[in-house]
Amino acid sequence: MNLAAVVGGSVSSDWKSWYAKGKEKYLFDGDTRHVVYNPVFNYCFFWDGGCFLNLAEFEDELPDLDLDVILYANERHGLDESNWDKYSVARLKNKYPKAKVIGFIKEITVPSHRYKNWIRFLNDSDYVVAPATGRMRKLPVYKTIQSELNKKINFFTSPHDIESIYDKFYSNVKDNAIFAYLPNPMHRRGRTVEFAEYIGKKYDILVIKKPFTNGSNDAMYMSWEDFTNLWSPCLWHFNLDPSNLQQGQHVVAVANVGSINFGGMNESHQVLFPETATCDESILEEKFVEYLESPEKRFEVITYAWNKLNELYGIEVVKKQLLNMLENE
């Protein structure tokens, strides 16, 4: 089965189109390896012959491909009336007539002036898929979206290449250090840095942060691999993101490398590290002391997160969800 993950309208220019070869990504314009990482890319490795398309590169003509399934996320300017024909589901279907198009809900916060065309895009698709593992499936916003669709929302977990991350970054010997993780959006940073520095000073533990450039936490200047090499040796990972509308992809990686996450309200925080999935600093400090003083407790927490990771987030798990949806249409 040939699958393409496609994005239109919002994706960074860093997300170049590529094709899968083995476990690597290669740009269409040559044999240059592409190293940008996002879990949605893992759909392209479900079967041989997968690829990723950034439609901004193909506004004039789509590439000649033999596709069976298209996972399509259309957002932002791709939903504007002036750009509709370039980013419509109909254009994909005309070029790839045998392919089933899956409308992928990459974000659930859509501006009001684009909402109508976003629903139109989802209704034009053959299926609708939203990435959610547990409690996010019950968010009121999904009930609202479902009421406007002509087909049901299918909930998948996000596929993570657990084996590759483990091989590259896992270690059972960790530095007794805290990594203070900051998402790029300011409103999602909460009191992560302040709390990390408080705990670090009180318990004499090194606090590590991503280097800032020009006062910004811009992710563009550091590769994903370099960034992971920076934080993965730390035993403690602090991320007090207060949003309950986010999946929390980063904390999935935290569980994958054998570190322990503290704080935050994203879905993966609750699934993988339920005892510390809060922004209540008194609870977090109490748990930190408990874990700090008990190797047995740390092992229990890391083992629980590892088992949940493999149960819910593996590539084969999500591939099975996709096949079940396609076979039961």
PLM regions and their residue ranges:
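Conserved catalytic-core segment of nucleotide-activated headgroup transferases in glycan assembly
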Residues: 17, 24-27, 160-224
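Extended catalytic core of nucleotide-activated donor transferases of GT-like folds
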Residues: 2-8, 25, 35-144
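C-terminal "capping" alpha-helix adjacent to the active site of nucleotide-linked donor transferases
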Residues: 275-299
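A charged, aromatic-enriched C-terminal amphipathic alpha-helix characteristic of glycosyltransferases
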Residues: 31-35, 292-327
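Short hydrophobic beta-strand element within catalytic cores of glycosyltransferases
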Residues: 256-264
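Short alpha-helical segment that forms part of, or immediately flanks, the ligand-binding pocket
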Residues: 228, 249-257
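Short beta-strand->alpha-helix junction loop in the catalytic core
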Residues: 107-108, 134-135, 148-168, 213-214
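Acidic donor-binding loop of glycosyltransferase active sites
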Residues: 229-246
